[in-house]
């Protein structure tokens, strides 16, 4: 092959292996890194052709026969079921709590599933290595171990839509087929996958958008920033597993310092050298465990990253070009796998897999020996077993059957399940090392419900009362203990029931225990619903009182009626008519109007002023329908016509004081209806009202000059009356107009109110209860002196029929009934007060087994007295037994406990000495006499010579810090909540945690339950107090210490004597990065200058954030290069918050770039001014985007109005440094070919490149090329000297750049 290379590429190696996916990857990577894109794609094409050629010759197919289920499965399932039955027995004996049982079941099935998976692989490997499924899955062609496991192993445990694990596993696989239950549980988990995929695609897209926005202006702008800092790289480890080996992390990095071999001190690699695959491999092989490299995190370039700090462009395996937009590449690299992560859950169909703990299994049958000096602490495992936690690391002795000694190392924190000299079987779990960080735990509660009814009994249960913030009393169990439910039948009785039994009485089956009565409060006439059978009547009505009008009939008013709303008229025998204001079926209350008299006697023709003359009104009973008139008198009415207009005064066609005739135009299209004098009411040149006052003008005489006496009413018998030359009562007021003032004499219309009676003949249904009556009443509708604004007439007074109720029963309401008379369409009015009584068939609770009998004690139309019993309900005993207790639980209920024959069991002990005493609690499986085992749990009630009587019961173990819902001696029914257990559980670790967790880290959110962080570095001492609280003390080298008190609930992840670093977590949970930054900064600022302290504190948090993001992606087997995350994290940690501006122009609370504030402070030092004080801050990606220097970029991201307004107020300038700003205003972006921000690229650099060309290039220049050689790509192109005269060329470029700048 004739090639034009600056270096001789390595010769291809012969790979004598099965070429599976992994090997193919290696081959392609080799071709790409040595020969560039073009040749690598050519090779890929050739391999594809080769693959297809053979695919047509032979292929693999899947058949049912290939799905081989390992024969050990049946045995494994049998073993697991036995273990689960054992756990259930423990639970029934009250040895473990319901939570521990659940946890044990889940772990047991999970381990069984894992074991079966290993069996499947082993079975294929040993018996059928050419099995098509095995070949496909393990060559990497299609499928993975998880899917194979579901096909031929067992589907295992599934999670429900809330992410909680269902404790019923799917034991079958797809080869055997699923049962209906299996299928439904399966669909449950799979549906979750589908929904999640749909939702998370959007989440992932939004994450990418935010990342692009935060990093879009990071461009490679210079070659070397000459930084004096680097970061330390070593293997990335989590849970004792190497996630990313050092070799992979070094690839494409630039060294910060020259590396020497640890053995020979030879130079392995030079400072500023970029590391390729071979060098990285060589460094690791030479035994170097950690290397300091250049990193975007420590780059000193302002608002960019330099070539050396960034390292390789991973797309072509060589140093990144100037002008490369690395920010966008970083954002896409982190955002893109988000969509893949979403697909992960979907394919496994929600199958739960979790490496819950690393188990240590016994290598053989044997015995364990524990030394005397052994330091352990007794704990209760999550399965409710007692075990020891090792406080230090130990090597323990295990002896096999031939007494040969073997040593096994147990690390600190290991849980040991065996005691000294205890025997164990091969592959038995003897210890467990919990994986502390990867599992996300959450605090949850679970209700403990009783499975049978009976009496609550506390056994060794210590309780304490607490008052919570709301003032409620809470009973909780600080230590835990046992709670027994001693069985018996519980009956719930309402407090009003009449109990017919006494304690210790024997009751027969179907005997009446209690009776509840339905009583009528008022008495009256009984009405039963005819259609109902007496056996199941649910309600009956009692007519307490009823009144009817005998001398009036109701007819339908056809003129006013509509289909939906009929109108009725009440006609009296004397000819008076009333309009009905209520319909049949309406409910009316005291003083409510029934009907209104049809009458025009008190109607006016216009508006006016109302005056009362000689009568009183009832002020108390004011309602919407006016005031009730007491006595006789007259209403005086002074008519006037009021027009309410809202118009400009210039539009008015009349003026103040003008006398007009009827029909005069006041404003356009508005005419007066009466004649009179005009009064105008205006406000701010706007006419509100025009009033036309009828009357005549009267020139005031000299004698009457008292202006305060007007307006007034003058009657004909008044001494001054003659002066006014009028007829009838008059109303005098002043009149103002242009010429001057005069008096206006207005006519007064008098409406007489006489005391005429309306004769109502009322008839009462019962002789005793006359609670209600119908009475007529007159009401005046306006107040004394009120102005009625109207141009049309109004009614001044109305006569109503109202319902009146006895003053001692004001709450009664009556039903309106129209009772048909003898003729059609004619009705009589009845008002009836009804008492509706509910007759509940289930007065004693819902329970099916409780039998009740209800009987009626009255007949239809029977007249009963107040307080009479209407119906009775009897509660019958379900089975015969003794009344154990009658328990008044609260004001409303009372509970009765009856012990039946089935609740007590007798056990023959055949003259043996009993090993128990009366009152003891025993559990099933306990020995009660020599050779006699109790089959049921319960309490010993009686011991006779030959018999022991046991009252059966169920024990429930209550864990510590549970909240009790019952008290000792309470009676409970099946399904009642006994206690709320508080516990920690691990969430399933699928990507449901992935994306939100990445978002949480990158948005720098405070975790919900953050872990406690150490305030100083030092040595830990752990103590436990009596309350089971843990006291942690961290002692530093200078003798100072910090103390932390932890409650029993918080899980501690450090151990005694351990050395801890600054800001390391002490308890379980995710650390709060803001707190971490604060701790580091406060610690460093006491020991070094402010700038250095801020830089170092930020660097610590940066490295933590990078590792956290990597952890999440690695848990899903997604590889992302560190440098991409570093670029994003650099943007999150570039700002500081000003605390005190000193003599600078900065304000407290302002966010400034760290480098910028340091430059300002340096200037202050020179001018002897006071420098600014600040503290570093961690901003989430959204906040960083909004706080960027460019307001155009920030506004195009979120909160456009706010950003632009603030920028305008502050008078900001946008320097257009990033890509986004330039795109928005339509300029060339400053990346790639548009990169012209820096023109001081050293000329010698280009010369150097030219001089590096080897002679082989000159020789090969004129030789012919093969067809395969006309493949040019970036990697090769950069090695060609495409510039004939580099110096002249460079000058031309420089001129062009300068010209474009001038333009």
UniProtKB/Swiss-Prot annotation:
Binds 1 Zn(2+) ion per subunit. Keywords: Chloroplast, DNA-directed RNA polymerase, Metal-binding, Nucleotidyltransferase, Plastid, Transcription, Transferase, Zinc. Its EC number is 2.7.7.6. InterPro entries: DNA-dir_RpoC2_beta_pp, DNA-dir_RpoC_beta_prime, RNA_pol_Rpb1_3, RNA_pol_Rpb1_3_sf, RNA_pol_Rpb1_4, RNA_pol_Rpb1_5, Rpb1_funnel_sf. It is an enzyme of class 2 (transferase). It is found in: Plastid, Chloroplast. One of its GO terms (cellular component) is chloroplast. One of its GO terms (biological process) is DNA-templated transcription. It comes from the Eukaryota. Its cofactor is Zn(2+). GO terms for molecular function: DNA binding; DNA-directed RNA polymerase activity; zinc ion binding. Zn(2+) binds at residues 225, 299, 306, 309. Its main location: plastid. Pfam families: RNA_pol_Rpb1_3, RNA_pol_Rpb1_4, RNA_pol_Rpb1_5. It catalyses: RNA(n) + a ribonucleoside 5'-triphosphate = RNA(n+1) + diphosphate. Belongs to the RNA polymerase beta' chain family. RpoC2 subfamily. HAMAP family: RNApol_bact_RpoC2. In plastids the minimal PEP RNA polymerase catalytic core is composed of four subunits: alpha, beta, beta', and beta''. When a (nuclear-encoded) sigma factor is associated with the core the holoenzyme is formed, which can initiate transcription. DNA-dependent RNA polymerase catalyzes the transcription of DNA into RNA using the four ribonucleoside triphosphates as substrates. PANTHER family: DNA-DIRECTED RNA POLYMERASE, DNA-DIRECTED RNA POLYMERASE SUBUNIT BETA. This is DNA-directed RNA polymerase subunit beta''. It comes from Rhodomonas salina. The gene is rpoC2.
């Amino acid at each position: 092959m004739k090639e034009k290379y600056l270096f001789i590429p390595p010769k291809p190696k012969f790979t004598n292996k099965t070429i599976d996916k992994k090997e193919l990857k290696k081959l392609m990577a080799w071709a790409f890194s040595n020969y560039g894109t073009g040749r690598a794609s050519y090779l890929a094409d050739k391999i594809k052709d080769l693959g297809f050629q053979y695919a047509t010759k032979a292929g693999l197919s899947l058949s049912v026969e290939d799905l081989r289920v390992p024969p050990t499965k049946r045995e494994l399932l049998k073993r697991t079921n036995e273990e689960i039955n054992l756990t259930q027995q423990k639970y029934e004996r009250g040895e473990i709590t319901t939570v521990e049982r659940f946890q044990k079941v889940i772990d047991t099935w999970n381990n069984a599933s894992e074991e079966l998976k290993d069996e499947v692989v082993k079975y294929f490997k040993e018996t059928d290595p050419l099995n098509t499924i095995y070949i496909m899955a393990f060559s990497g062609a299609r499928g993975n171990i998880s899917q194979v496991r579901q096909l031929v192993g067992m589907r295992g445990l599934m999670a429900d839509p809330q992410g909680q694990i269902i404790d019923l596993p799917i034991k079958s696989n797809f080869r055997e087929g699923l049962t209906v239950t299996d299928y439904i549980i399966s669909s449950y988990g799979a549906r979750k996958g589908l929904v999640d995929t749909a939702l998370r695609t959007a989440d992932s897209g939004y994450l990418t958008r935010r990342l692009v926005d935060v990093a879009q202006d990071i461009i490679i702008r210079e070659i070397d920033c000459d930084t004096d800092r680097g970061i330390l790289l070593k293997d990335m480890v989590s849970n004792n597993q190497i996630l990313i080996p050092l070799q992979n992390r070094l690839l494409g990095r630039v060294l910060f310092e020259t590396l020497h071999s640890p053995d020979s001190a030879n130079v392995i690699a030079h400072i500023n050298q970029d590391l390729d695959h071979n060098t990285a491999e060589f460094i690791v092989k030479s035994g170097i465990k950690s290397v300091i490299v250049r990193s975007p995190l420590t780059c000193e370039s302002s608002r960019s990253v330099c070539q050396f700090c960034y390292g390789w462009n991973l797309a072509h395996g060589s140093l990144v070009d100037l002008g490369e937009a690395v920010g966008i590449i970083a954002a896409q690299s982190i955002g893109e796998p988000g969509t893949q992560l979403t697909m992960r859950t979907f394919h496994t169909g929600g199958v739960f897999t979790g490496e819950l703990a690393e188990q240590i299994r016994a290598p053989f049958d044997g015995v364990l020996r524990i030394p005397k000096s052994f330091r352990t602490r007794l704990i209760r495992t999550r399965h409710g077993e007692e075990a020891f936690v090792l406080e230090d690391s130990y090597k323990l002795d295990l002896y096999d059957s031939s007494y040969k000694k073997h040593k096994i190392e147990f690390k600190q924190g290991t849980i040991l399940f065996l005691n000294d000299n205890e025997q164990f079987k091969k592959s038995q779990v003897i210890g467990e090392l919990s994986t502390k960080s990867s599992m996300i735990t959450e605090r949850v509660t679970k209700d403990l419900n009783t499975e049978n009814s009976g009496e609550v009994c506390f056994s060794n249960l210590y309780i304490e009362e607490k008052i919570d913030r709301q003032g409620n009393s809470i009973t909780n169990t600080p230590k835990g203990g046992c709670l027994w439910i001693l069985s018996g039948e519980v009956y719930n009785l309402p407090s009003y029931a009449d109990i017919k039994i006494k304690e210790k009485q024997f009751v027969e089956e179907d005997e009446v225990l209690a009776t509840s009565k339905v009583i009528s409060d008022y008495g009256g006439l009984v009405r039963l619903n005819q259609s109902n059978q007496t056996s199941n009547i649910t309600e009956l009505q009692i007519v307490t009182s009823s009144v009817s009008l005998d001398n009036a009939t109701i007819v339908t008013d056809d003129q006013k009626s509509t289909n939906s709303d009929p109108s009725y008229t009440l006609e009296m025998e004397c000819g008076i008519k009333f309009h009905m204001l209520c319909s049949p079926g309406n409910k009316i209350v005291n003083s409510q109007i029934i009907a209104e008299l049809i009458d025009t006697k008190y109607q006016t023709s216009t508006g006016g002023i109302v005056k009362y003359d000689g009568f009183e009104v009832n002020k108390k009973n004011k309602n919407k329908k006016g005031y009730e008139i007491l006595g006789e008198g007259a209403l005086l009415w002074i008519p006037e016509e009021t027009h309410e207009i809202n118009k400009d005064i210039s539009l008015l066609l009349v003026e103040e004081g003008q006398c007009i005739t009827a029909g005069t135009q006041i404003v356009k299209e508005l005419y007066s209806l009466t004649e009179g004098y005009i009064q105008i009411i205006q406000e701010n040149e706007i006419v509100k009202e025009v009033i036309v006052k009828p009357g005549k003008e009267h020139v005031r005489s000299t004698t009457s000059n008292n202006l305060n006496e007007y307006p007034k009413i003058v009657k004909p018998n008044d001494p001054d009356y003659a002066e006014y030359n009028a007829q009838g009562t008059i109303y005098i007021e002043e009149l103002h107009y242009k010429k001057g003032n005069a008096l206006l004499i207005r006519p007064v219309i008098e409406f007489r109110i006489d005391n005429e009676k309306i004769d109502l003949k009322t008839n009462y249904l019962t002789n005793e209860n006359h609670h209600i009556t119908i009475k007529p009443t007159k009401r005046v509708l306006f107040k004394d002196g009120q102005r009625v604004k109207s141009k049309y007439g109004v009614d001044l007074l109305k006569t109503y029929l109202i319902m009146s109720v006895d003053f001692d029963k004001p709450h009664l309401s009556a039903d309106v009934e129209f009772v048909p008379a003898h003729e059609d369409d004619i009705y009589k009015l009845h008002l009836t007060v009804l008492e509706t009584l509910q007759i509940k068939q289930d007065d004693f609770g819902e329970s099916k087994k409780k039998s009740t009998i209800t009987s009626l004690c009255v007949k239809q139309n029977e007249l009963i007295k107040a307080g009479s019993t209407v119906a009775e309900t009897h509660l019958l005993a379900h089975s015969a037994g003794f009344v154990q207790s009658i328990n008044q639980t609260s004001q409303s209920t009372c509970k009765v406990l009856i012990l039946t024959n089935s609740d007590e069991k007798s056990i023959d002990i055949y003259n043996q000495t009993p090993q128990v005493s009366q009152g003891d609690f025993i559990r099933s499986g306990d020995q009660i006499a020599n050779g006699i085992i109790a089959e049921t749990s319960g309490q010993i009630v009686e011991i006779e010579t030959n018999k022991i009587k046991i009252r059966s019961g169920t024990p429930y173990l209550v864990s510590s810090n549970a909240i009790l819902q019952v008290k000792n001696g309470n009676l409970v029914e099946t399904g009642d909540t006994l206690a709320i257990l508080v516990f920690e559980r691990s969430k399933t670790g699928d990507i449901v945690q992935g994306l939100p967790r990445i978002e949480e880290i990158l948005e720098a959110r405070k975790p919900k339950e953050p872990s406690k962080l150490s305030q100083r570095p030092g040595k830990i001492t752990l103590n436990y107090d009596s309350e089971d609280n843990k006291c942690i003390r961290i002692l530093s080298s200078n003798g100072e210490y910090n103390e932390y008190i932890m409650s029993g609930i918080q899980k501690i992840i450090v151990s005694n004597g351990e050395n801890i670093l600054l800001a390391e977590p002490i308890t379980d949970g995710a650390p709060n990065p803001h707190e971490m930054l604060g701790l580091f900064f406060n610690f460093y600022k006491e020991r070094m200058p402010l700038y250095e302290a801020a830089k170092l504190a930020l660097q610590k948090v940066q490295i933590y954030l990078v590792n956290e993001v990597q952890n999440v992606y690695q848990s899903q087997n997604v590889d992302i290069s560190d440098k991409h995350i570093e670029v994003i994290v650099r943007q999150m940690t570039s700002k500081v918050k000003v605390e005190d501006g000193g003599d600078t122009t900065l304000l407290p609370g302002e966010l400034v770039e760290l480098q910028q504030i340091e430059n300002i402070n340096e200037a202050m030092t020179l001018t002897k001014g006071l420098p600014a004080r600040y503290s570093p801050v961690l901003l989430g990606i959204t906040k960083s985007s909004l706080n960027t220097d460019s307001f155009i970029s920030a506004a195009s991201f979120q909160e456009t109005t706010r950003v632009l307004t603030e920028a305008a107020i502050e008078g900001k300038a946008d320097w257009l440094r990033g890509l986004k700003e330039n795109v928005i205003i339509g300029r060339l972006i400053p990346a790639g070919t548009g990169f012209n921000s820096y023109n001081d690229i050293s000329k010698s650099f280009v010369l150097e490149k030219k001089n590096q060309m080897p002679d082989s290039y000159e020789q090969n220049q004129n030789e012919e090329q093969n067809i395969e050689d006309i493949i040019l790509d970036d990697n090769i192109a950069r090695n060609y000297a495409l510039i004939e005269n580099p110096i002249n060329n460079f000058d031309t470029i420089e001129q062009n750049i300068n010209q474009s700048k001038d333009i």
